[in-house]
């Protein structure tokens, strides 16, 4: 047993017979989470994080946060700006672990978290922000093949858990039985309705608002287990960010190719992604497709606009002269696609919290449009905001580190209904008929990813 501080205890075990999925299935408890990264993605993350049985939860609606303690059963209501409240409520405990996340909050922030009064009506009635706070976290190191159990006491006097027993549970425990799932899709909005939205949005574009992102929700009935659905999705569509998080009355799962923002100490890291191209079937085709993606003038222009917007956005939370494009228009590979991405870094301003950085980057450009303020106003006035799908999911560590991924391709499961969405960026050059065909194709391809031996019943 190691101690990194008076409040933090650790135990390391050999992981050569374990996987993050197996650990999750053996871990006993409620409101479990799994955050992982695909080894099939070049430059994938080194660590996976697993946890269960949070100490408390924060649930935000409009201008108030409900804080619920699982220890006492008490609920406390706090009024004010959601991010100001979160900064005040989130525990901050320093430690010297080498891991980016060793305990803290896991959850999501939706589109409306930065808007106290919104006229938009989201079809999934979920909180604007929702976080569970975990004192005990399991870290899987894919490089050293080790698993580290970490417990951080929020209250110094609280009794510590037995990490030896937890290690025994993970190494020899009985995992949950294999489960299956199937689904039956149904339409939530017709193509005619979406075409009307596209046409109306296109007509409003001008020099002040050059692009706006619209979303089309589609639904399916789920029969079976949500975690089986996640396992199928991660197998068919691995990505740098893969997540499965259980809440009281819903589950959020998905695989995302794109980070929204990271904060590591004083460093703020954004990786804007714009431009995709299918993978080739051979190494030679991959290189040829990379060349086509890189040499596409329209994609490069659009990518440059996004990078410029991200740099400008970071000026509100970073020293201006510290903001630099470290990597420009780099091509990254996922299992199915090539992505053009850049890396922008800056140094956070003193006295600011990582949550200030997160607030400054929401809603993401990828889910709203450019310029952000004008696109946001338009979507809210026309009741077309995308709720959780227009936000981000990730962790906020006790140590102040933060890492969030975009949630546009998430699946939200509530009352056996799967909520999903397609998005399209509308410009003055958008061909409505072509967009409708592409959206329908995207929906079919996404549902096909979830099929297993026929999958759909």
Where are these regions (language model features)?
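Extended alpha-helical targeting/anchoring segments
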Residues: 1-457
